[in-house]
Amino acid sequence: AQSRFLAGYLGPLVRKVLVGPYREWTPVSPEQKKYWHPRYRAESLTALTRLVSWNHEINLAKLKIPVLILYTPFDDVVEVSSIIKKFNELGSKKKSLLSIPSKNHVLAGAITSPETTELVTQEMLKWIQGLNSKE
């Protein structure tokens, strides 16, 4: 909901009031602190929310390329119902929506989701190999 305010005409002003000059978060591990950027300029939030808003205007029925969407039903960053809705709008004949049992928005990687990295890798490889089939 906040993102709608940030994407609008008054987005920069709203951002300054709600966030200030920087967006900061606390890393959950020393590795995350080492390899991620937990502090960045808040202007990027306005740009990101405008990009997301623009994406909502795209006619996905016209999209005919193969699409694989991986998501977690536990996502606290993206609304899962929106992921499913957008997937159903895709005009692609070869499309797959795959739920990954990760507790994190980032579905794979040694730092945030080591328990699902192998699963994500295998599912992606299987999907890519399936592109050659004549379904």
Regions found by a protein language model. Give the residues of each.
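Short alpha-helix in the alpha/beta-hydrolase fold that links the catalytic acid
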Residues: I65, E79-E89
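Short, conserved active-site loop motifs that form the nucleotide-linked donor/cofactor pocket
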Residues: K94-S96
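Sec/Tat-exported extracytoplasmic proteins
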Residues: V52-N55, V67, I128-N132
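Catalytic active-site module of serine/aspartate enzymes centered on a nucleophile-bearing elbow/loop
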Residues: L98-E135
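Hydrolase active-site cap/lid region
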Residues: A1-T49, I65
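Surface-exposed acidic, glycine-flexible loop patches that form ligand/cofactor-binding
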Residues: E57-A61
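Short beta-strand/loop motif that positions the catalytic acidic residue
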Residues: L63, I69-D75
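Soluble non-cytosolic domains of exported or imported proteins
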Residues: R39-A42, V77, P114-E118
